[in-house]
Curated annotation (Swiss-Prot):
It comes from Picea abies (Norway spruce). This is Cytochrome b6. The 4 large subunits of the cytochrome b6-f complex are cytochrome b6, subunit IV (17 kDa polypeptide, PetD), cytochrome f and the Rieske protein, while the 4 small subunits are PetG, PetL, PetM and PetN. The complex functions as a dimer. Its cofactor is heme b; heme c. The lineage of its organism: Eukaryota, Viridiplantae, Streptophyta, Embryophyta, Tracheophyta. Heme c binds at C24.
Amino acid sequence: LEIQAIADDITSKYVPPHVNIFYCLGGITLTSFLVQVATGSAMTFYYRPTVTEAFASVQYLMTEVNFGWLIRSIHRWSASMMVLMMILHVFRVYLTGGFKKPRELTWVTGVILGVLTVSFGVTGYSLPWDQIGYWAVKIVTGVPEAIPVIGSPLVELLRGSVSVGQSTLTRFYSLHTFILPLLTAVFMPMHFLMIRKQGIPGPL
């Protein structure tokens, strides 16, 4: 392996003079995601994804586990930071024309990552299975009901049954801890490699 050549390529990449702090928003979003991976992994040691034990396990994490309150708080703060930085990043890219040719596919992968980020928020919000989480899930999963023909089957697919319950929590837990992180781990490198290949767009 030509490790030195790879290291030189990474460390000697030309940075255009117009690049400022606003071009770091995507990197901050990535950092927030990595913090959530670390803290989320720690919380899985204590969280129990059942409707009878989920809330109690979160309470146990917050009150009994050493630094459990800090781990969960950092997870929540970094989640909010990730959403905020992603929104600002989208505005910066749009205002600087970073979505235009030849960077259309970079924009597409970014939009997919945006959808995944929102999905993280929706699924994670339900996991404590408190009153707020329960009713949020009920409302969100009920939205597709308005779609003609496929609305009802889609709602049942999201919930795992006709009503919100254990099947719903299991689905959301699986999405939040396995499927969404896996998809993000696929699209993030694609997004960064495209940026690396095509470079940073010019100034306004």
